[in-house]
A protein has these predicted regions:
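Conserved small-residue-rich beta-alpha loop and adjacent elements
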Residues: 103-169
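Conserved NAD(P)+-binding/catalytic subdomain of aldehyde/semialdehyde dehydrogenases
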Residues: 175-263
Length: 427
């Protein structure tokens, strides 16, 4: 990890830069696959599964028999953990239900909002080196609570055509409607356009590699909404002299092991803490099975020494991390100053892993600085809000002339006339 001591404000813009993700170079490949999926449906999906996932599939759909079999293939301990996590995620997201109210903006003018679930949503769960069954819970649970009628899940199978059993069990626990064996760009295209087997959805959620990111961005231009732009995983830890260096190092490594393009940042006011965390990172790194991945991520990462905790907080807000851990003695006062972050973890015992799995908050969060403008996945992500307004004759008299004047000054005569004919009818 690169160590930076007492950087000036002028240096901050360079410090907060992430490794650049240039998906433009992938767009030609992604576009070719998406076009093929749009034209050829299931046959194209199966062909790309054979090419990229090295599996020959007769059918894309996961059967009920496969799901039942999966339940006997995971330990009771894991099943109980999935159920507990699902309960907590449900409890947290249930509190996010929208309760709109009717408001009279002027006499005779009543306005309100209605929250309506997106009818069909698609969830993408990547394959790779670890089965992300936790992401199944994070995406499917709020979709079910929101009232989405159809929850489709796509995930790549292994070379034997099997989906990891924990993913199947998590999908059943969370209420997924149907599961399909498809990964990568072909899965995104199938959900965006629809195939003979895989239904077209209206919004796609879920993480993935750069090809998946590029595919989501492309389909979002014309065919299907997406949850948010995405980048590599990241964490920022703010520490002071009272922090536990073993805990801090463990938190940094928990994100570094995600992928070689992950980034972890330590901001501290203590030179001694910086040194002790550096030592702990090196010690714990040697014990990790994913040491090679974490080591490469650490090469993109930084330890930053600053003068005050206020400065640390300002630097963090400039960075806008996906995950922010405030492991300081006065974490409560610093928490009030957070304005840019995906999810925040307060105190010595709130490890980021808790939010990743079982505290109840959602772990699908904006990365790569998008926390400046985006929220993480929440219940509203699965809803649309439709506005209503009702005008009585009194309402026409209240706002009619203002509407006429504004329309006239925008030179939209038909707009003005739509109000004028009503005013005349009341004369």
């Amino acid at each position: 990890m690169r160590i930076i001591r007492y950087p000036s404000r002028e240096e901050w813009s360079n410090i907060v830069k992430r490794p650049q993700l240039d998906v433009s170079l992938l767009n030609a490949i992604v576009d070719e696959v998406l076009t093929d999926i749009r034209r050829n449906g299931d046959s194209a999906v199966k062909a790309y599964e054979a090419k990229f996932d090295h599996v020959e599939l007769q059918s894309l759909a996961v059967t009920d028999e496969e799901i039942r079999a999966a339940e006997g293939m995971i330990s009771k301990e894991l099943y109980d953990a999935l159920v507990l996590a699902h309960q907590n995620i449900s409890t947290f997201h249930e509190t996010q239900r929208f309760e709109g109210s009717k408001i009279q903006t002027q006499p005779g003018v009543t306005c309100w909002q209605k929250s309506v679930p997106i009818e069909k949503v698609g969830l993408y769960i990547p394959g790779g080196t670890a089965p992300l069954f936790s992401t199944v819970l994070m995406l499917a649970t709020p979709a079910k609570i929101a009232g989405c009628k159809e929850i489709i899940l796509c995930t790549p199978p292994d070379r034997h055509g099997n989906v990891h059993p924990a993913i199947l069990v998590a999908a059943k626990v969370a209420g997924v409607s149907r599961i399909f064996k498809a990964g990568g760009v072909q899965a995104i295209g199938a959900m965006a356009y629809g195939t003979e087997s895989i239904p077209k959805v209206y919004k796609i959620f879920g993480p993935g590699n750069q090809y998946v990111m590029a595919a989501k961005q492309q389909v979002s231009l014309h065919d299907c909404a997406i949850d948010m732009p995405a980048g590599p995983s990241e964490v920022c830890v703010i520490a002071d002299a009272t922090s536990n260096p073993e805990f801090v190092a463990a938190d940094l490594l928990s994100q570094a092991e995600h992928g070689t393009d992950s980034q972890v940042i330590l901001i501290t006011t203590s030179e001694e803490m910086l040194k002790r965390v550096e030592e702990e990172v090196n010690l714990q790194l040697e014990l990790l099975p994913r040491k090679d991945i974490a080591s490469k991520a650490l090469s993109n990462s930084k330890m930053i020494l600053v003068s005050t905790l206020d400065e640390a907080m300002q630097l963090s807000n400039t960075y806008a991390p996906e995950h922010l851990i405030i492991a300081t003695q006065n974490y409560e006062s610093l928490a009030d100053k957070v304005v840019n972050a995906g999810s925040v973890f307060l105190g010595q015992y709130a490890c980021e892993s808790a939010g990743d799995y079982a505290s109840g908050t959602n772990h699908t969060l904006p990365t790569h600085g998008y926390a400046l403008a985006y929220s993480g996945v929440n219940l509203d992500s699965y809803h649309r809000k439709i506005t209503f307004q009702h005008l009585t004759p009194e309402g026409i008299r209240s706002i009619g002339r203002a509407v006429e004047v504004m329309a006239e000054n925008e030179k939209l005569d038909a707009h003005k006339n739509a109000m004028t004919v009503r005013i005349k009818a009341l004369s």
